[in-house]
Amino acid sequence: MPAQPAQENAQDADDAQANATMETRVAGQGQPKRVGRWTLAQLRQTDGIIPSQAGWNKGDSQKLMTNFGTPRNTQTRVKSENLAEIPEEVLMRTHGEVRLQSGTNKFESQRGMTGFGTGRDVCREGVHVNQAPSDLQPLDEEKIRLSDGIVRLQAGTNKYDSQKGMTGFGTARRETTKMTDSKHPDYDHERPDQSEIPLQAGTNKFASQKGMIGFGTSRRETTKICDSAHPEYDPESSIDSSTIPSQMGSNKYASQKGMTGFGQPRWEVLDPSISWQNRKSQGMVRLQSGTNRFASQQGMTGFGTPRNTTYEAEAGELPYEDMKKSETVIPSQAGWNRGDSQKGMTGFGAPRDVKGKHLKRIWELEYPEEAEASLDRL
């Protein structure tokens, strides 16, 4: 009997350890670590609990929950006081069934089904469909190739079809209405002519291009008015195809005599020796742009060479020493730096000193104390 209280005390100690919470104690002190008014153990008790504003999952369990992506069973999970509870073994029977909202595959079988992506063979005769492929007699290669141009039944069949009466590739389809045309009883809608526009787009039958102008010719839509100054002028009959109407000017009595061909440059020259037939004049500039006849490039410098205006001004040859002296001189056309000096100039990138004499004088008048102090330093 004395051993029983000892066992009870040990069991109480185990229960106390199972329900114990983690506490962080500070070395040298017996008090648990606090965060504000709460201990760390008290704060960690709610780590696995969703706060109330998001709902409450305390005491909840995921028992009997389906996996991710499993459709919800809305047939057996209905809670109602009028319905009897379904036993567990009955519930487990429906796990392999598709729910009624998606249809049902109960009593279904995949027997005889082909693999995924396998084409369906619907060309076999009905009496041989149930035979296994191993029981079928092999076909000759000639018989197999006879069906290469046949579309299978699942897509329809083109057997005994013909392209008779079909139009060529890219030809627009003419879906004409099958009706009786009282005005044109000889017109057959089933076999329209290639040169005729079908009726749904209008028709050009009996049409003519008589009186039509050529391609690219501008249309002359003149106003039908009576010209009191020229009563003989008729807008409908007076306009000739070769005459420009008066509103754009007139080319009446005009001539193209002496005109050059299309795209040919005009030669406004007075010298008959300059001609496109004379190869000697191919390098000449025509008079309308000036002329370079008898011109020469003698004494011209190369491309990019600066002009030496000093040499041209003196009109003589310079010695080698004098030519070297003028290499640092900017010619007159760009200005003149002769006699200049860089004395007092700052280095490259140095800020400019804008405190000139005028600004310094204003500064001395406004700040005399600082001006005297600067003079004392000197």
From Swiss-Prot:
Stretches with biased composition (Low complexity): 1-20
Keyword Repeat (UniProt): yes
Single GO term (MF): actin filament binding
Superkingdom, taxonomy of origin: Eukaryota
GO cellular component: actin cytoskeleton
Tissue and organ distribution: Found in the longitudinal muscles below the hypodermis.
Record keywords, A-Z: Repeat
UniProt feature, compositional bias: Polar residues: 238-256
PANTHER family: CALPONIN (PTHR47385), PROTEIN UNC-87 (PTHR47385:SF11)
Note: There are apparently several forms of the native protein which appear to be expressed in a stage-specific manner.
Stated name of the protein: Calponin homolog OV9M
Organism expressing this protein natively: Onchocerca volvulus
